[in-house]
Amino acid sequence: MSDPLGDMLTRIRNAQRARHAVCVAPASNLRANVLDVLKREGFIRGFSKEELRPGVAQLRIELKYNDGEPVIKEITRVSRPGRRVYSKIKELPRVYAGLGVSILSTPRGVMSDVEARTANVGGEVLCRVF
């Protein structure tokens, strides 16, 4: 798999279109950090890490709906393995005039664009969520 984070985002997108309550994805630290940001921003209910066997784990993602409609309207990968996208904090555009969130990988960890502006750090723009 060349883009594990992109795979997880696609699993979330597909599960929400199919109105699933839960989706699973292979576990990694980056994926868990991105899910933590999504949970803090209110886009998912939560997630848990399940150990399948020693050394192999998966993330169980609880999706969130509002009156039967998915909370996540759009989730797209920005920086890909073939085209990395980095942004200074002053050049980071707002997603849908502040209604959406960009998730960044910064030297201080994975955080939302709001947290990055507060901490005044830029980094790699992993994805956009609306």
Curated annotation (Swiss-Prot):
It comes from the Bacteria. GO terms for molecular function: rRNA binding; structural constituent of ribosome. PROSITE patterns: RIBOSOMAL_S8 (PS00053). Keywords: Ribonucleoprotein, Ribosomal protein, RNA-binding, rRNA-binding. One of its GO terms (biological process) is translation. InterPro entries: Ribosomal_uS8, Ribosomal_uS8_CS, Ribosomal_uS8_sf. The keyword rRNA-binding applies. One of its GO terms (cellular component) is ribonucleoprotein complex. Pfam families: Ribosomal_S8 (PF00410). Signal peptide: none annotated. One of the primary rRNA binding proteins, it binds directly to 16S rRNA central domain where it helps coordinate assembly of the platform of the 30S subunit. Part of the 30S ribosomal subunit. Contacts proteins S5 and S12. PANTHER family: 40S RIBOSOMAL PROTEIN S15A (PTHR11758). Belongs to the universal ribosomal protein uS8 family. This is Small ribosomal subunit protein uS8. It comes from Acidiphilium cryptum (strain JF-5). The lineage of its organism: Bacteria, Pseudomonadati, Pseudomonadota, Alphaproteobacteria, Acetobacterales.
